[in-house]
Curated annotation (Swiss-Prot):
A motif (YXXXXLphi motif) lies at residues 54-60. It comes from Homo sapiens (Human). Keywords: Cytoplasm, Nucleus, Phosphoprotein, Protein synthesis inhibitor, Translation regulation. The TOS motif mediates interaction with RPTOR, leading to promote phosphorylation by mTORC1 complex. The modification Deamidated asparagine is found at N99, N102. It is found in: Cytoplasm; Nucleus. This is Eukaryotic translation initiation factor 4E-binding protein 2.
Length: 120
């Protein structure tokens, strides 16, 4: 049997991927899950597999929206991060704890205890 490159197979024609631009007027229309490409482009996919790519101008416009300036709901209480004013008090307590630990470490001679145990 011999085969040749021209045995009835035609090379497929290349086609452009169909795209369309949809203007979104409300941030609530954005999906909840995003993905990124190695180049940093943000995109999302629909349940049907359609990829939605967000351009830079659109995302920069949304950065200054009132919704972007509002913290998310149901945020945990993290002192100094989500609740202001407690960072100074907590940092003083933390510094005192570090000083106590350093004083405790100085009481032991260097090399008394093994850093970790290893079974051979």
């Amino acid at each position: 049997m011999s085969s040749s490159a021209g045995s009835g197979h035609q090379p497929s024609q290349s086609r452009a991927i169909p795209t369309r631009t949809v203007a979104i007027s409300d941030a609530a229309q954005l999906p909840h899950d995003y993905c990124t490409t190695p180049g940093g482009t943000l995109f999302s996919t629909t349940p049907g597999g359609t990829r939605i790519i967000y351009d830079r101008k659109f995302l920069l416009d949304r950065r200054n929206s009132p919704m972007a300036q509002t913290p998310p709901c149901h945020l945990p209480n993290i002192p100094g991060v989500t609740s202001p004013g407690t960072l100074i008090e907590d940092s003083k307590v933390e510094v005192n704890n570090l000083n106590n630990l350093n004083n405790h470490d100085r009481k032991h001679a260097v090399g008394d205890d093994a850093q970790f145990e290893m079974d051979i």
